[in-house]
Structure formats: C-alpha cells, structure tokens
Amino acid sequence: MFPSIFNQAWELSAVKDYDPEDKSGFFSSTYRAYNCAMTLICSAIIVCDRFLARFLYAKDFYSAWKYVPWLTIAILFGALSGYMGGFFTAVKDSRIFATSTLVGAVSNIALNLILTPFMGPMGAAIATTICYVEVFVVRYLQSKKYISLKLNVLRDSISYIFLVLQSIVLLTLPENFLMYGINVFLFGLVFLLYLKDIQLILCKVIHRRGRR
C-alpha cells in the first residue's frame, strides 16, 4: 500500500517540478531515499519472515512464508518502476509504460510456463520477481532520455544481490541460529551500504522538525 500511495504522490510532484538536468538534485536524492527505505524494509522482512509467519498465518497457510522473499523483492522493484514512471508521466510519453509493461507481461507468461510445472507456486513467485526486475531495468534505461539521475548503480546492484542471497539462505537452511545469523549479517551489510543515505534522511527529518 505504501508504494502505491507514494508513487501516486510522486507522479504529481514529478510533473510539477520536472527538471531534465536535475540541477537541484531533488529527483536523485528522492530516489536514493526511497530505494534505501524499500531495500532495508525488504531485507528486514526476509530476516523476520519465518518468525512472523507463526503469528500472521494460519496453520494451513504457514508454508506461504516460502514465497514471501521473492514476492517482497518483486514489490521493491515494482515500487522503483513506479518511481521511474513519474518521469514518463511528466514528459507525456505513454509508450514507455506500454513497452515496459509488455516486456514484463510476456516474460512473466513465458517464465510461468517454464518454471511452474517444475517448481509449482515457487516458480510463479520467481517468475513474478524477474518480471518486475525487467520492467524496472527497461524504465531505468529509458528514463536516461529524459532526466540525468546521479545514482550509485553498483552499490544498489550489490544490495539487490544480498537480498537474493538472503532469500536463498532462508529457503535452503533449516530455521536455526546459523540461518538467522547469516541473514542478520547480510542485513547489516545492506545497512552499511546505505549508511550515508540513512544519515541524510535522518538529517532532513531532524531539520524539518527543527523548523516547526
């Protein structure tokens, strides 16, 4: 729900304040803050997934925890795709929406046909994640035509790899101290990768409260 609300508000802001050169750094800093928050939340959910499943799911649905990591990563990339979509709304280029959505839809259908017969619901979850990643990549590459964003692509890519590693650890290791230890460690690495962005967010929040 949060990504949906944010992206709706973001589209209005992107149209109003659109600057292809991003001279003020507003669009870049907003993206970094949004990506930082969503990635950390995603990582934390993966860490706590099996623990929370005991309280949130009925016994018959407890096994649904297995699909949470991949679907959470899908939500992350869906949110970032929505952010990039704000730029296309600002420049009134609906073709990118159609193209990226079509790429994701075709990929999702193909991967579901390939993975689901062998992996069941897990195959569908993985296919959905890959689909959202593809949509994000297409929109990110196309956004370069309209705006100059200063992003740390290498740092972000490493953090996404850590999310995948967390998911693999969660799904392959038994629920014990080692499993939680590795995933908490990976969460710590993600946290350190975004430490500067976290500090920037906190400084802005404190500054705004101080002005009230």
Enumerate the predicted regions with their spans.
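Helix-loop junctions and terminal segments of transmembrane helices
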Residues: M1-R32, G85-A90
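Short runs within selected transmembrane alpha-helices of multi-pass transporters and secretion channels
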Residues: S4-N7, V47, K66-K92, I96-S143, ...
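Membrane-interface helix-boundary motifs at transmembrane edges
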Residues: P20-G25, V91, K144-L154, L173
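Interfacial segments at transmembrane-helix termini and the short loops linking adjacent helices
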Residues: S28, I45-L76
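Selective transmembrane-helix segments that form parts of the transport pathway or gating/packing helices
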Residues: Y31-T39
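Hydrophobic alpha-helical transmembrane segments in multi-pass integral membrane proteins
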Residues: S43-I46, I109-L113, L163-L178
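Hydrophobic membrane-spanning alpha-helices of multi-pass integral membrane proteins
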Residues: L102-V106, D156-V169
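Membrane-proximal transmembrane or re-entrant/amphipathic helices at the cytosolic face
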Residues: L149, L170-R212
